[in-house]
From Swiss-Prot:
It comes from the Eukaryota. The lineage of its organism: Eukaryota, Viridiplantae, Streptophyta, Embryophyta, Tracheophyta. One of its GO terms (biological process) is defense response. This is Uncharacterized protein At1g24000. Signal peptide: none annotated. SMART domains: Bet_v_1.
Length: 122
């Protein structure tokens, strides 16, 4: 296995891109923050992209660097959004597995966020 890599997942959500992206940017309870801390590196509200750097003692046992990037684009008027979530990583050593479990947990989180937005009554 290589030390550096990237994993990416593409999926659709039912929410409009603006609402979904705003909810993600404003959320302070992202699941990948449980084992460390996150620092926002870049946010583009027009393009609906964001990159975060993850760190902390638990993460640093396995990864020298771990960054997540999201891009949200509208499918069409009232048709939901496409989401691309990518992790760029550098492992501490080659025997560490790629962070597939973090990707899987992230998708579950995004689906729950989508449902919460859809069920929210203003």
């Amino acid at each position: 296995m290589t030390l550096k890599g990237a994993l990416s997942v593409k999926f659709d959500v039912k929410c409009p891109a603006d609402k979904f992206f705003s909810a993600f940017v404003e959320d302070t309870n992202r699941p990948f923050e449980k084992n460390g801390k996150t620092e926002i590196e870049a946010v583009d509200l027009v393009k609906k992209t964001m990159t975060i750097q993850m760190s902390g003692s638990e993460i640093q046992k396995y990864f020298k660097t771990l960054k997540g990037s999201i891009a949200v684009t509208p499918i069409g008027v009232g048709d939901g959004s496409h989401v691309v979530w990518t992790f760029h990583f550098e492992k501490v050593h080659k025997d560490i597995d790629d962070p597939h479990s973090i990707i899987d947990e992230s998708v579950k989180y995004f689906k729950k966020l989508d449902e919460a937005i859809l069920n929210f009554k203003e």
